[in-house]
Amino acid sequence: MLEGRIVTVSSRTESPLAAPGVPGAPRRLSFARIREPLAVPGLLDIQTESFGWLIGAPDWCARAAARGTEPVAGLAEVLAEISPIEDFAGTMSLTLSDPRFEEVKASVEECKDKDLTYAAPWFVTAEFVNNNTGEIKSQTVFMGDFPMMTAHGTFVVNGTERVVVSQLVRSPGVYFDHAIDKGSEKDVHSARVIPSRGAWLEFDVDKRDTLGVRIDRKRRQPVTVLLKALGWSAERIAERFGFAPLIMASLAKDNVAGTDDALLEIHRKLRPGEPPTKESAQNLLANLFFTEKRYDLARVGRYKIDKKLGLRAPGAPRVLTEDDIAATIEYLVRLHAGERTMIAPGGVEVPVEVDDIDHFGNRRVRTVGELIQNQIRVGLSRMERVVRERMTTQDVEAITPQSLMNIRPVVAAMKEFFGTSQLSQFMDQRNPLASLTNKRRLSALGPGGLSRERAGLEVRDVHYSHYGRMCPIETPEGPNIGLMGYLSVYARVNPFGFVETPYRRVVDGRVTDEVDYLTADEEDRHVVAQANEPLDAEGRFLAARIPVRRKNSEVELVDSAAVDYMDVSPRQMVSVATAMIPFLEHDDANRALMGANMQRQAVPLIRSEAPIVGTGMELRAAVDAGDVVVNEKAGVVEEVSADYVTVMADDGTRKSYRMRKFNRSNQGTCSNQRPIVDEGQRVEAGQVLADGPCTENGEMALGKNLLVAIMPWEGHNYEDAIILSQRLVEQDVLTSIHIEEHEIDARDTKLGAEEITRDIPNVSDEVLADLDERGIVRIGAEVRDGDILVGKVTPKGETELTPEERLLRAIFGEKAREVRDTSLKVPHGESGKVIGIRVFSREDDDDLPPGVNELVRVYVAQKRKIQDGDKLAGRHGNKGVIGKILPTEDMPFLPDGTPVDIILNTHGVPRRMNIGQILETHLGWIGKAGWKVEGNPEWAKDLPEEMWEAPADSNIATPVFDGAREEELTGLLGSTLPNRDGERMVDDNGKAVLFDGRSGEPFPYPVAVGYMYILKLHHLVDDKIHARSTGPYSMITQQPLGGKAQFGGQRFGEMECWAMQAYGAAYTLQELLTIKSDDVVGRVKVYEAIVKGDNIPEPGVPESFKVLLKELQALCLNVEVLSAGAAVELAHGVDDDHERTAANLGINLSRAESITETELSG
């Protein structure tokens, strides 16, 4: 029913070129042996398809019609649900229909620039009907601005790019469970009917073998009471459930006479305080389970119930029916009795078994369209109440649809979702892979999902049904482990929200190219072989018995005739990021997890370089991520510049593609595009015209290929530390550009308007040298911390004047108006070059918040070279911090004098079990050197013809689970091309004789040398290093604030104090607890003494001690300090003008704690 079919006609091919289907793709020699009959689907389809369904996009409607399903858009569906809205008497009604959109108001770029939301005006047709007179009034009503999805699956909300993450939730339906009672150790079974919205209905067999029911989580009562309340007589119950002693015993004990008594009994349990009547009890039960407004199973819930219980009622409603309840009770009784099958009312035989809630047949995905639809449903239901009230209060003659409707609840619900929902995330834009995986994320958290505190191990664990649907490797480390997943490469979400994966159909033992998409439930009924099972020329299995997967079982050997399906690709089970790890099959899963996650943290470098050793996934990932410019129509390149590429298409149309130049991403990395085509070049549709960040020739390029030696070196690479060559610093090999945005606004204050100006009090001309006449820094200026970016003054109010000044003011009638310098300055520890300025002003009709007259944004770019303390990583979870940067001449070098770029420690490999990094190093050397296979060796018999010879600097693809074998690596290492001196520097084992750069002597043992792909991660030491001398203090405790963002101090905690006490360092400890912390008077005096060169004065009483005294006083304990029988005043030594002294020294004693925005990642 749900299976999609794709028929591809092709036969086994020997072509080794990775990434077919993208014209102009760079050549990459592939070790792949297995032909994939199905191309990787669009990697952003989970977002774009779902949003297309929501708004009823024309291309989505065309695809739905082609599939043979009725194209009902999500918005039309929710409007149909709520219509008609009737008043309390039923005399008039309002019907909403035909949702449609006008053109979006501004382009994506303009929205980002001006802090707007990328949205289109949304209109519906509202029809008001007066049922008494038959009068109909129809009107088009504006429903607000509807946020639209960009071409790359994102939303722009208030100028920031956001992603709505898909949510993994338990599917509506009926679920059967089994547990063992702790006291009696008897089996107890239960059943739950879970709707999409509405009350739960729970049945259970307890340890006393009685069958009970709980309605809406209330008190348990016999199941026969519910059946009688539904109108069943005792005879009918006996006729239907006569086979079940459980129910017959319950019926015998049941003293409820008939339907009326049963209804009253249920009412008493559900509404204990209210007086029960037959009508109210009947309405209560009807509203709980049988009214569409109050109870909704959703299409998927109805499908799951019908499938589980074997009901085949055509056009069954989305509410519960008597048949559902009766079939659920019968299923539970038979399950408790230990039966294996049951004949459903329709004559269908269904298996009787308990459900696994973590199975992907019972968990579904709420994609972006459904999440927004649910939010609109909430907004419309709030609007419905307003409409009802207005119907009763307004004059019937004067009513129009527009006057009845208030769209504010709908707009507010949308705003709330996009702005504050856990599933609407600030987009991860560190690099194209990060943004792509962000859109393919599946989260079990969020409203209606799990909470990370309550989620147990079972729900986080890898499940066999995840195969081909959700990646078993890629998930965050930390509290969210297992609750966030990523869609596998070939997976797709079907109309019910279940994740499907494709399989090749096996017919009469022959593997065909016909592809079926199966859900986890459907796959459980079949026997599936893996993609790398050898086939003959006709597509039949070579082995008589082959390993397969079956429901609930480990891999087992079966006869080849029993196989129903075969995987379409070896990389079918992993996600995009995991599929980009070469030799994944040789890495431990924990390290592969780190490798997949760390690829998302790579920062774009000044010059990107595609990996020598790739997996063939790089091109497709980069193109689908949307950071490269892709040609739309075949034609000829007419004009190329740094800012745009113009293509004259074959049909005579001309299109210019604009480049993004040095834009700031959400994470502060640099997003820049540059053309890779030439004037006059022929380009095909789908060909990459320009590279973006982290791409080279249209392929994902997250790092650099560096010559690596794996060896210890003087202990400087102990514990994962890394030694780098100075060459990488000098030649900007690992240099990245980071762009910071600084913003300031000029507001109206109670004392007058703030002003952006060059005229700043008490500031020298040197400081103002880079400011223009408006007071804004010029583009191109080099700035460092403390420099003024935008000059601004704020009114201070009237000041106290001396009598003489007062007399002069009275004579000349001039007020003493003073201003404070509140200029925007470069924050502590930052520097760079000003690359952009945006000025928004109320005078220019820019849309600014209330009270703001002017807003200035300054963009400062910083070129960060690699340095000690920065974090580097490979793709196999092999991460480390740079411990030392050696001069190039001191680095170990090869026999031909080539110095290595990076030295990694051998200890980083064995216990971590990520051998993939060693194999990558060897294959990297092979690709860099080139190779030629001589003769006809045994190891090369499976290599495609084109792989027998390759020039130097060849890029290679080794796809996951279908890559280079160990014997091929050994053979190719022995077949590498010699250098210009005719030498092969690396032997068959991948090792070379290295020479010590300092002494020129060879090291006593051969060392593994090759090329490894190294990423520079976003954990940069410049963002983390922090020091403070004086700074802000907390208003309450008078102690320094904490953290780099607040320019805080280092916490000296309780245990650190113990350490000081243990060493008897009394004076150091006193200093730390007083003048370096909260001795308000003492710290000012110390600062003064340091400035003047005097001795440090005695510390005073810390503020926290005074707080302690106040707390004791609150307990009615008076604390006094006595000296020679006389009380000593604790406030002793308070300098009345210490505030003034501090001000003169330029320090602020009690700056309030600033609230800083923290970015949420992933």
Swiss-Prot record:
Catalytic activity, EC: 2.7.7.6
Any one of the GO BP annotations: DNA-templated transcription
GO MF entries: DNA binding; DNA-directed RNA polymerase activity; ribonucleoside binding
Catalytic activity reported: RNA(n) + a ribonucleoside 5'-triphosphate = RNA(n+1) + diphosphate
Keyword Nucleotidyltransferase annotated: yes
Swiss-Prot/TrEMBL keywords: DNA-directed RNA polymerase, Nucleotidyltransferase, Transcription, Transferase
InterPro entries assigned to the protein according to its UniProt record, in alphabetical order: DNA-dir_RNA_pol_bsu_ext_1_sf, DNA-dir_RNA_pol_bsu_external_1, DNA-dir_RNA_pol_su2, DNA-dir_RNAP_su2_dom, DNA-dir_RNAP_su2_hyb_sf, RNA_pol_bsu_bac, RNA_pol_bsu_CS, RNA_pol_bsu_protrusion
Top-level taxon of the source organism: Bacteria
SUPFAM superfamilies documented for this protein: beta and beta-prime subunits of DNA dependent RNA-polymerase
CC per GO annotation: DNA-directed RNA polymerase complex
Short name of any one Pfam family annotated for the protein: RNA_pol_Rpb2_1
Subunit structure: The RNAP catalytic core consists of 2 alpha, 1 beta, 1 beta' and 1 omega subunit. When a sigma factor is associated with the core the holoenzyme is formed, which can initiate transcription.
PANTHER family registered for this protein in UniProt: DNA-DIRECTED RNA POLYMERASE I SUBUNIT 2
HAMAP family in alphabetical order: RNApol_bact_RpoB (MF_01321)
Family: Belongs to the RNA polymerase beta chain family.
Function: DNA-dependent RNA polymerase catalyzes the transcription of DNA into RNA using the four ribonucleoside triphosphates as substrates.
UniProt name for this protein: DNA-directed RNA polymerase subunit beta 1
Organism, as annotated: Nocardia farcinica (strain IFM 10152)
